[in-house]
């Protein structure tokens, strides 16, 4: 079964993409079937200068488990943001300080202070490079490198939805007013521009070893 292209990122466009020495291009592919609960991914770090035989249109697979495993082609306009760990990765003392601080902030936006930090400040929703995983569907779990034991860091988040849970849409990207969906996409959804669906609407995090990116990566659904 041929693997499908999922993302192609150039280091020149994505400041947080820490490419291994001698490479400046990351290509992410996956198998469009669950292994066992989400597509299995493969990472290829390359030098863009060596990529000369370029396909205009990637081949579609003869079969796939779900339509949501065939990404719609998209052009990226990277936007750098600052985010913070999910509240579940913070100490109990810091969680309480954040809860108290969030009360007046949440009141101004008519939001629940219990969820204000996670919705508005901690994790940027959508597809992203680097950053922190959201733990709204499972508890935090250790992510040691299977080769050397180093704590792994998120390389790429593949998300079902681009928008967050706050009504103020604090994480909405800066949009190019002239940008419009391709005329070929009669079902374009700005909240899901890639049309990818992970599980019942979750995220698939790909994490790599910061000490040696060539070590096997791990995958996690949240």
Predicted regions mapped to residue ranges:
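Preference for intrinsically disordered or flexible, low-complexity segments
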Residues: 1-222
């Amino acid at each position: 079964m041929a693997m499908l292209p999922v993302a192609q990122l150039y280091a020149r466009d994505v400041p947080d993409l820490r490419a291994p020495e001698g490479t400046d291009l990351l290509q992410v592919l996956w198998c469009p079937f669950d292994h066992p609960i989400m597509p299995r991914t493969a990472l290829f770090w390359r030098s863009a200068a060596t990529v000369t035989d370029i396909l205009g249109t990637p081949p579609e697979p003869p079969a796939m488990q779900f339509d949501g495993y065939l990404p719609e082609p998209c052009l990226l306009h990277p936007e750098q943001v600052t985010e913070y760990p999910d509240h579940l990765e913070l100490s109990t003392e810091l969680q309480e300080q954040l809860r108290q601080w969030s009360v007046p902030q949440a009141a101004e936006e008519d939001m629940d202070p219990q969820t204000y930090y996670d919705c508005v400040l901690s994790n940027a929703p959508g597809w992203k490079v680097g950053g922190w995983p959201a733990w709204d569907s499972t508890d935090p779990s250790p992510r040691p490198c299977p080769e050397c034991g180093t704590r792994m860091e998120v390389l790429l988040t593949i998300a079902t939805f681009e928008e967050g849970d706050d009504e103020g849409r604090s994480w909405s990207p800066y949009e190019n007013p002239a940008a419009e969906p391709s005329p070929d996409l009669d079902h374009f959804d700005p909240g899901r521009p890639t049309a990818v669906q992970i599980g019942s609407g979750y995220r698939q995090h790909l994490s790599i070893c910061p000490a040696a990116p060539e070590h096997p990566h791990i995958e996690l659904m949240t």
